[in-house]
Curated annotation (Swiss-Prot):
The keyword Iron-sulfur applies. Belongs to the quinolinate synthase family. Type 3 subfamily. The gene is nadA. It catalyses: iminosuccinate + dihydroxyacetone phosphate = quinolinate + phosphate + 2 H2O + H(+). Iminosuccinate binds at H46, S63, Y141, V142, N143, S162, H256, P257, E258, T273. It comes from Bacillus cereus (strain B4264). Pfam families: NadA. This is Quinolinate synthase. Its main location: cytoplasm.
């Protein structure tokens, strides 16, 4: 079942009048509705969201953190999630049946999450089992669909975040000889390498050709990486780093581990969104930084730290296009429909999928 089949009802067309409203009028209406609804309304906002949206967020953070905060907010009947599909799915799975999770724009997806669908994954597991038998455990990045989390849950696996990936990969190897990591090959590769697993003991599963790509001995493969990636972090290159080293030799380079192995290896630091934020905050005044992550977040960090010289690692970087679909007009539209007693763009994950996906989430939460 696709996510669009799981969501009822579906509204994707923003009414015309929101295109003609001034920013001031929209901001005023959002404030009015937030004040009117009080604790009945909770708006989580991901770090990659636009400032025009983040300013109204009741909590800002990464995807799992926001889902957990939403789940702990029992007073909120409506959770208007300013993020992308898989984040809203996770929030729905962790909240109660009485709470309603709404995504302001149904087009706000995640290309990386969509790179691993359940049919491809089931087929891959079947083929890999022919090669490796019962020696594998699946781990999925939380940046994945509910169906993929459920797959991991029913096959003894778990979810991971960029913050706890090392802990969870280490745990996985106490369970089985081999790890299947999806959907982001780069986070999987960088994490495994950081734990001492050589590149020639890693393979890549291509879901489009149903083939395993590897250089070494197939019997020695320890990590099978799904051929997926983040389209934003894929755009940071070693050439970007070489340019910074040449033109700004005293500048620190910090990147997200969704960047490719070569970029992470050439950087000074690599870590999760929270790690990047904390590193910049704790850095001394006057320090210089080139950051390799999503542009909305980089711009926000620049604004928050005028005492430091901060640039994007890639000067031509664009924000995450799907994350950027959540804007002020869509946020206001979602809030006004709630105010009228209507519900649009509701995220509702199948009960069986939820049960199995929560197994995977809990296996992670119990260990970190």
């Amino acid at each position: 079942m696709s996510i669009l089949e799981q969501v009822q009802p579906i509204e994707t067309m923003l009414p015309e009048r929101y295109y003609t409203m001034s920013t001031e009028d929209m901001e005023k209406r959002v404030r009015e509705i937030k004040e009117k609804m009080g604790k009945m309304l909770f708006i989580p906002g991901h770090h990659y969201q636009k400032d025009e949206v983040v300013q109204f967020s009741d909590a800002a953070g990464d995807s799992l953190q926001l889902a957990q905060v939403a789940a702990s907010n029992k007073d909120a009947k409506y959770i208007v999630f300013c993020g992308v599909h898989f984040m809203a799915e996770t929030a729905d799975m962790l909240t109660t049946d009485d709470q309603v999770v709404i995504l302001p724009d149904m087009r706000a997806g995640c290309s990386m999450a969509d790179m691993a669908d359940i049919e491809q994954t089931e087929r891959a597991w079947k083929e890999l089992t022919k090669l490796f038998g019962d020696t594998m455990i699946p781990l999925t990045y939380v940046n994945s669909t509910a169906a993929i989390k459920a797959f991991c849950g029913r096959n003894g696996g778990a979810t991971v975040t960029s913050s706890n990936a090392k802990q969870m990969v280490s745990w996985a190897f106490t369970q089985k000889e081999r790890l299947v990591f999806l959907p982001d090959q780069h986070l999987g590769r960088n994490t495994a390498y950081d734990l001492g697993i050589p590149l020639d003991k890693m393979a890549v599963w291509d879901p489009h050709t149903d083939s395993l790509e590897y250089d070494g001995d197939i019997e020695e493969i320890q990590v099978i990486l799904w051929k997926g990636h983040c389209s934003v972090h894929q755009n940071f290159t070693v050439k970007n780093i070489e340019s910074i080293r040449k033109n700004h030799p005293d500048m620190n380079i910090i990147v997200h581990p969704e960047c490719c192995y070569e970029v992470v290896a050439a950087s000074d630091y690599a870590g999760s969104t929270k790690y990047i934020i904390d590193m910049i905050e704790s850095a001394p005044s006057g320090s210089k930084w080139a950051i390799g992550t999503e542009m909305n977040l980089v711009n926000r960090i620049i604004q928050q730290h005028p005492d430091k010289e901060i640039v994007s690692l890639n000067p031509f970087m664009c924000p995450c296009l799907t994350m950027n679909r959540i804007d002020l007009p869509h946020l206001l539209w979602a809030l006004e429909t709630i105010e009228r007693g209507e519900e649009i763009n509701v995220i509702s994950v199948d009960k069986q999928v939820t049960t199995e996906a929560v197994f995977a989430l809990n296996r992670m939460l119990e260990r970190v």
